From Swiss-Prot:
Additional record remark: Completely overlaps CCZ1.
Top-rank lineage group of the source organism: Eukaryota
Protein name per UniProt: Putative uncharacterized protein YBR131C-A
Length: 29
């Protein structure tokens, strides 16, 4: 596992965690 893969997974997890927040923001507007 390379560092690039590690950072990619970290960003992916962060994005998945933020997805519900973005969806809520979109529905509120």
């Amino acid at each position: 596992m390379t560092l690039r893969h590690y950072f990619f997974l970290q960003d992916y997890k962060r994005n998945v965690e933020n997805l519900p927040f973005y969806k809520n923001q979109a529905t509120l507007q």
